[in-house]
């Protein structure tokens, strides 16, 4: 761990199409091997698919709703106490909530069966906005783990 203190939070430039920092972060998390243009095509393609399927729904609002639904409130962290390792439930800070939600949505989308990544991502976002899908299962599993280990909450640091 660094002894130089906390580094300032780096800001992300808003995405060019919608002017949203959340979408820009989402694009950066979809990106693999530095291929940002491919990631932009995937995310914008997914938003187009969402707009086609739900003409009444705004794609940015749906993405935000999906992220809010998937974001975990608590998670477990390992803590060693006297030779035993305990899974200690801790609250998740807001920046980590969004990062975990994005990561889980993208991972769940990659595992889906649709034929193109924009369709996979759109389907996962729609499911998450309606409280179903793989990312929601992951959040429920995390909450269950925290609930099961509630007895060790006094080991928090």
Swiss-Prot record:
Subunit record text: Part of the 30S ribosomal subunit. Contacts proteins S9 and S11.
Spans through the membrane: none
UniProt-recorded name of the protein: Small ribosomal subunit protein uS7
Database matches in SUPFAM superfamilies: Ribosomal protein S7
InterPro entries tied to this protein: Ribosomal_uS7, Ribosomal_uS7_bac/org-type, Ribosomal_uS7_CS, Ribosomal_uS7_dom, Ribosomal_uS7_dom_sf
Pfam families associated with the record: Ribosomal_S7
NCBIfam families: rpsG_bact
Organism: Stenotrophomonas maltophilia (strain K279a)
Biological process terms in GO annotation: translation
UniProt record similarity statement: Belongs to the universal ribosomal protein uS7 family.
PANTHER family, per the entry: RIBOSOMAL PROTEIN S7 (PTHR11205)
């Amino acid at each position: 761990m660094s002894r130089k203190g906390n580094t300032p939070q780096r800001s992300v430039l808003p995405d060019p199409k919608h002017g949203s920092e959340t979408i820009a972060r989402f694009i950066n998390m979809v990106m693999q091997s530095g291929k940002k243009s491919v990631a932009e095509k995937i995310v914008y393609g997914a938003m187009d698919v969402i707009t086609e399927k739900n003409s009444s729904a705004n794609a940015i609002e749906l993405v935000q709703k999906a992220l809010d639904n998937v974001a975990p409130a608590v998670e477990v962290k390992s803590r060693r106490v006297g030779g035993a390792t305990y899974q200690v439930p801790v609250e998740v800070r807001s920046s980590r909530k969004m990062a975990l939600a994005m990561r889980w949505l993208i991972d769940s989308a990659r595992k889906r069966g649709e034929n193109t990544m924009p369709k996979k991502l759109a389907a996962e976002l729609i499911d998450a906005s309606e409280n179903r899908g793989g990312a929601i299962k992951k959040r429920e599993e995390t909450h269950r783990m925290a609930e099961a280990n509630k007895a060790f909450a006094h080991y928090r640091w």
